Amino acid sequence: MSKIKILTIVDMQNDYMKGGPMAVKGADELVPIINELIKNGEYDAIIATQDWHPSNHISFASTHDKEPFSKIKVMDKETGKEEILTLLPRHCVARTYGSAIVDGLKKKKDYI
């Protein structure tokens, strides 16, 4: 059985880049590295994931009229247990610029 080589690109989206509401330190520096991996053409498939939320997502602080990173109590419907939820800044809202794959990343039509 032959092996398939896959490159998985996880959540390289505008809202996670420098200046975004959920900026990840060093994420911008990954763009040229990923572009080089894509350019090498040594992968049988490229998978790119995107984090997408509705504008009123339960994890957004704005949904609860709270400050980002404040905490609220929520009920887990499956277990019936109360849990603490840390509220996040509004990010990666479906079909917005922030949820799009970062501009500098090479895009291929055949991403999975």
Question: What is the predicted role of each segment?
Answer:
Residues 18-27:
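Short glycine-enriched, charge-decorated loop/helix-capping segments at active-site entrances
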Residues 17-18, 96:
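Short glycine/serine/threonine-biased micro-segments
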Residues 32-112:
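Active-site alpha/beta core segments
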Residues 2-7:
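Extreme N-terminal starter segment of soluble prokaryotic enzymes
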Residues 8-9, 13, 49:
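Generic enzyme active-site microenvironment
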Residues 8-10, 27, 58:
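A broad "ordered helical/assembly scaffold" signature
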